[in-house]
């Protein structure tokens, strides 16, 4: 009940922030569909509500909501508003998510792509806050807060998961800080620019967290374009933890190497590199909406930093099709196929992976 009240309070607060300065608003509802190995086919809807202010017509606050249900009986509800405060040069991003998400467990530090799988169903409520203070020349400071409640309602094999951290019901409470640089020309389909983010988070018992650990992430992206229709994209991602983290919050190599399931390789730390060539070779009203991508992903999950070894990196290569819903800012439907030896995966979704 408290969780529902929290979301309701956020919604009412967001309405009150409009005040008398509201100038224009936009509202839209879109159906969604996608496919991945983790979910099978899924469908849902997403609603967008944007409203601007008289004094700052170029800035819009967001009230967005998403609901999805999958072929594997997974449910996700997400409310993610964004509020701009131009006088103080800041913005606040909130994210309240509920998930009832039947999943697969292959063990922690697994190295076998053919490892035996065990099913379990967690129910997770998470509330995140990202307060961003904009500095000069595309730099920004961030303050983060993360609150999580998780309980596993079903287990296929309770004995296997008995001693795994995060097997029981738990609360996580953490705060963090970061700095970012962003010169991208678009977030939906970037054709040029740089993005860099360094983030440090701490989950502490004095904040009410059942687990004490620290997490450091580094996300670097570069985009180089021959022209708007031919783009090379690169990403370097690093994630390290100290202390004990619930298994569901570990580094998932499959989120970055597209030939593998997300949950197949769980590790305390991880590093990944991705490269893509995205191109739209055709012209005409229909042709200009059809594009393609070639990609290469590689990375490694490891227990300790000293275990980093290029020989242990897992790789995938693949290709994809892009269909532009909007041609001005290139919001694309994405159909990707990645493969590595006997492992392969299909991913159908909206927007680019990075």
Locate each region found by the language model.
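Hydrophobic h-region of N-terminal signal peptides that target proteins for export
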Residues: 10-18
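C-terminal outer-membrane beta-barrel translocator/porin domains of Gram-negative envelope proteins
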Residues: 78, 175-180, 184-290, 294
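Membrane-embedded beta-strand positions of outer-membrane beta-barrel proteins
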Residues: 29-33, 63-67, 92-96, 141-145, ...
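Gram-negative/organellar outer-membrane beta-barrel architecture
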Residues: 21-29, 33-171, 330-334, 338-345, ...
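Short loop/turn motifs that connect adjacent beta-strands in outer-membrane beta-barrel proteins
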Residues: 20-26, 53-60, 86-91, 138-140, ...
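Transmembrane beta-barrel architecture of outer-membrane proteins
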Residues: 75-77, 98-100, 121-127, 147-151, ...
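Extracellular loop and loop/strand-boundary signature of outer-membrane beta-barrel proteins
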Residues: 65-66, 111-117, 160-166, 203-208, ...
């Amino acid at each position: 009940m408290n969780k529902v009240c929290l979301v309701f309070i956020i919604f009412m607060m967001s309405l009150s922030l409009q005040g008398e300065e509201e100038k224009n608003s936009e509202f839209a509802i879109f159906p969604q569909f996608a496919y991945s190995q983790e979910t099978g086919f899924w469908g849902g809807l997403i609603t967008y509500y944007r409203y601007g202010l008289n004094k700052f017509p170029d800035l819009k606050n967001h009230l967005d909501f998403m609901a999805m249900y999958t072929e594997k009986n997974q449910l996700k509800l997400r409310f993610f508003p964004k509020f701009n405060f131009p006088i103080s040069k800041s913005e606040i991003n909130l994210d309240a998510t509920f998930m009832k998400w039947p999943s697969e467990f292959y063990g922690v530090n697994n190295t076998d792509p053919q490892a035996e799988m065990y099913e379990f169903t967690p129910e997770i409520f998470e509330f995140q806050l990202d307060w961003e203070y904009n500095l000069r020349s595309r730099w920004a400071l961030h303050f983060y807060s993360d609150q999580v409640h998780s309980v596993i309602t079903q287990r296929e094999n309770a004995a296997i998961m008995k001693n795994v951290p995060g097997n029981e019901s738990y609360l996580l409470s953490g705060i963090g800080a970061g700095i970012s640089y962003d010169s991208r020309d678009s977030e939906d389909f970037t054709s040029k620019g740089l993005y860099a983010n360094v983030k440090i988070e701490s989950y502490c018992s004095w904040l009410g967290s059942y687990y004490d650990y620290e997490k450091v992430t580094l996300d670097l992206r570069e985009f180089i374009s021959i022209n708007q229709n031919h783009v090379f994209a690169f990403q370097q991602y690093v994630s390290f933890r100290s202390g004990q983290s619930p298994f569901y919050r570990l580094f998932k190599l499959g989120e970055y190497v597209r030939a593998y399931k997300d949950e197949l390789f769980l590790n305390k730390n991880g590093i990944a590199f991705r490269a893509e060539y995205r191109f739209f070779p055709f012209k005409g009203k229909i042709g200009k909406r059809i594009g393609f991508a070639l990609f290469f992903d590689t990375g490694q999950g490891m227990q300790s930093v000293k275990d980093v070894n290029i020989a242990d990196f897992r790789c995938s290569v693949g290709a994809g099709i892009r269909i532009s819903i909007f041609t001005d800012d290139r919001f694309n439907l994405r159909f990707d196929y990645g493969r590595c030896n006997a492992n392969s995966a299909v991913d159908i979704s909206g927007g680019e992976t990075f």
